[in-house]
């Protein structure tokens, strides 16, 4: 993917977040990269835009980001225990997120 300058900057932050072990920030930033690309990159191929919007892994990422950011009284998508006691699953999700845009 040929990223716009804005998306490239966000990707750099996502990589820095990942390297620092900030898994939640990585997931959020990777989705932000995709959001910027969809909104501003006029050179994206139509089929690729469709994949970004409806592809299984991209839908997973968008839904995961939304669950992390938006509160739901009935469920807790993340707790302090997830971050401080057992963050292995978050690390796996962050890695999966980054792989969507750098491979």
Tell what function each PLM region has.
Residues 11, 29-30:
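Inward-facing hydrophobic residues that define packing positions of alpha-helical scaffold repeats
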Residues 22-23, 73:
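Residue-level recognition of short, well-ordered coil/turn positions
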Residues 1-22:
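Charged alpha-helical initiation segments
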Residues 23, 34-49:
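Short, charge-rich amphipathic alpha-helical segments embedded
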Residues 56-60, 64-103:
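Charge-enriched, short contiguous segments at helix-coil
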Residues 25-27:
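Solenoid-repeat scaffolds in large eukaryotic assemblies
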